[in-house]
Swiss-Prot record:
Segments traversing the membrane: 8-28
Lineage of the organism: Viruses, Duplodnaviria, Heunggongvirae, Peploviricota, Herviviricetes
GO cellular component, one term: host cell Golgi membrane
Keywords: Host Golgi apparatus, Host membrane, Host-virus interaction, Membrane, Transmembrane, Transmembrane helix
Single GO MF annotation: molecular adaptor activity
Assembly and oligomerization: Interacts with host TNFR1. Interacts with host MRP1. Interacts with host UAF1/WDR48. Interacts with host STING1.
GO BP, sorted A to Z: positive regulation of receptor signaling pathway via JAK-STAT
Record-given protein name: Protein UL138
Function: Plays an important role in the establishment of latent viral infection. Modulates the expression of several host cell surface receptors such as TNFR1, CD36 or the MRP1 transporter during productive infection. For instance, associates with host MRP1 and induces its lysosomal degradation. Plays an inhibitory role in the host cGAS/STING/TBK1 pathway and upstream of IRF3 phosphorylation and NF-kappa-B leading to inhibition of interferon beta production during both lytic and latent infections.
Amino acid sequence: MDDLPLNVGLPIIGVMLVLIVAILCYLAYHWHDTFKLVRMFLSYRWLIRCCELYGEYERRFADLSSLGLGAVRRESDRRYRFSERPDEILVRWEEVSSQCSYASSRITDRRAGSSSSSSVHVANQRNSVPPPDMAVTAPLTDVDLLKPVTGSATQFTTVAMVHYHQEYT
């Protein structure tokens, strides 16, 4: 059997190399998540945990719109944006112990000369969205948002930081 001609074999090799490089770049960029997936795969309950974690992730993403700041668009695993505002939510997913206590949300006034901060529950932010010169750091403390998936051995805390930007003229 003759070898493939050069004009057929070269594009195939090129496509394979591009795919391999793309996979390696993805793994390098998401090394932390990849490491977690490898550890989960090596555990004996990897399939059950994978389903639980996916369900938890999707449910929490759906609940982000309950902040009352408009529709939310997912840009990556950790970055979300509101469709009608220039605000952004950064979400940190991390395992927490059962003894963990959840702090209430904080609104911090970032105006010049002001250092005041007040505690606000996320549920109350629906009707009291701060003006554009305020910066919000809001750990989601709603009971539904922090409730783990039924039967899940892992809990997650979702931390949402909403940044308000205003150009001064």
